[in-house]
Amino acid sequence: MASTFTATSSLGSLLAPNAIKLSSATSISSSSFGRRHNVCVRRSRPAIVCAAKELHFNKDGTTIRKLQTGVNKLADLVGVTLGPKGRNVVLESKYGSPRIVNDGVTVAREVELEDPVENIGAKLVRQAAAKTNDLAGDGTTTSVVLAQGFIAEGVKVVAAGANPVLITRGIEKTAKALVNELKLMSKEVEDSELADVAAVSAGNNHEVGSMIAEAMSKVGRKGVVTLEEGKSAENNLYVVEGMQFDRGYISPYFVTDSEKMSVEYDNCKLLLVDKKVTNARDLVGVLEDAIRGGYPILIIAEDIEQEALATLVVNKLRGTLKIAALKAPGFGERKSQYLDDIAILTGATVIREEVGLSLDKAGKEVLGNASKVVLTKEMTTIVGDGTTQEAVNKRVVQIRNLIEQAEQDYEKEKLNERIAKLSGGVAVIQVGAQTETELKEKKLRVEDALNATKAAVEEGIVVGGGCTLLRLASKVDAIKDTLENDEEKVGAEIVKRALSYPLKLIAKNAGVNGSVVSEKVLANDNVKFGYNAATGKYEDLMAAGIIDPTKVVRCCLEHAASVAKTFLMSDCVVVEIPEPEPVPAGNPMDNSGYGY
């Protein structure tokens, strides 16, 4: 304790000069202080400089044409990736090697056009891809192509003198009615069809489809499947049982298996402390209970200081106690949330002084139970005993609600991570490739496939290959009869014509005439009949495994219609005038030309 007081007194001496300076500051005269104050006030009003804006009015239709040019440039670029025979897009990277991608939303995010009005058009239609990606995780290219179709057909009729307000109202009502029709066409996905859904989304890669289906079968349809970048050229799948996080044991002296350098305990008790453990005396009651009960105990705390840690290690080495300790995962508020999650999984109570719980008075009632704990130098896995499943399910629902409210992607990612850890079984797919460029492209495809499979589980499946959207076009005539206004009916007709765009583009990318393909498909009354672009055959697409998740098709339709409505209602564009680049000043020390 003497050293502590010494440190404190020396700290006081270090602070003394500052104190003198502060007291001398008070001796400044009121007049000089006033002058200083006035100067400060003047400085606190920075000059406000507003960038000039350029206004583009749509008097002769040029503004809308420019916006549409931006839409078409983005849609044509993204469109080359659509379908089983779609090609890749190479993206330049300022740092590192170029990226080769087949993912619509990734391509769309990279596009910045030189003309500011065209760029706004591209940004408008990019929203359809981004929103579809956020909600369904796939179908981004289809959203862009469908939005292009709505806009192209809509611009024609608006240019001919139709009222854009009534036109967009007709598009909105028709899209809403078609979503209801889509639900009637949908069917629940069978386990055997999950692989087909994933394979179609991964560009007809059946190996990826089978792996995702296997992962789903191991952890259940509502289980958690995550992706990692693998170290080899092959794809791998493994399942992590229990809650796993990136924190290892504090001291290697806790190790029970010297070959693996790991700590393994069965039927282990857990003590959770949301503060630093500074004194070993605070742990005496809990440790004596563990010795009497003969059970192993795992301590998870913010930190364990040297004195307390030494006591734990000595008792472990003597064989008196089966014990291990680690620092709580996460930092700040997230650390407390992780501790609460562990408490719910194991049935423990977190020791927190703010809720009236102190460590020195803790007994058996605050301890949690785990059927198994495994600690390595860098990782800890806790497998619950299954008695707290109801509480875990409630916690997962709470976290899902937080995800819906979260605005930042990073926050959503961390919340999804917590759900994955709580769910008790996480399937991990390691994506392998020969090069880094191939790995990034492959990972995007597998991510799309995984998202499509999850979407299929949520809302069911429909026939793929763009055929469902084409079949929905035949439902538009009945919807038109429910619309009272003639111009709203024109809006419905716009939707009808645009619904064929995705199928035509899939056919075009496969080297076939899209109009001929759509006519042949519509000539057959069987709703499952369509064009298989991968094989070039007309067949029963459901039997051939060409399947789309209903949720993906619904999101494509809704978001494309929403973007088209915004576009067609626009009549003026405001853009910033870029500031001229400053002319570099000459070097005042440059004496060249003066004979030196």
UniProtKB/Swiss-Prot annotation:
Disulfide bonds: none annotated. Residues 388-489 form a coiled coil. PROSITE patterns: CHAPERONINS_CPN60. It comes from the Eukaryota. Keywords: ATP-binding, Chaperone, Chloroplast, Coiled coil, Nucleotide-binding, Phosphoprotein, Plastid, Transit peptide. It holds the Pfam family Cpn60_TCP1. The keyword Lyase does not apply. Induction: Up-regulated by light. Disruption phenotype: No visible phenotype; due to redundancy with CPN60B1. Cpn60B1 and cpn60B2 double mutant produces small albino seedlings. InterPro entries: Chaperonin_Cpn60_CS, Cpn60/GroEL, Cpn60/GroEL/TCP-1, GroEL-like_apical_dom_sf, GROEL-like_equatorial_sf, TCP-1-like_intermed_sf. GO terms for cellular component: chloroplast; chloroplast envelope; chloroplast stroma; cytosolic ribosome; mitochondrion; nucleolus; nucleus. It is found in: Plastid, Chloroplast stroma. PANTHER family: 60 KDA HEAT SHOCK PROTEIN, MITOCHONDRIAL (PTHR45633). Involved in protein assisted folding. Belongs to the chaperonin (HSP60) family. Part of the Cpn60 complex composed of 7 alpha and 7 beta subunits. Can also form a complex composed of 14 beta subunits only. Both complexes show ATPase activity. The Cpn60 complex interacts with the Cpn10 complex. Interacts with RAB during heat stress. Assisted protein folding requires ATP hydrolysis, but not K(+) ions. HAMAP family: CH60. This is Chaperonin 60 subunit beta 2, chloroplastic. It comes from Arabidopsis thaliana (Mouse-ear cress).
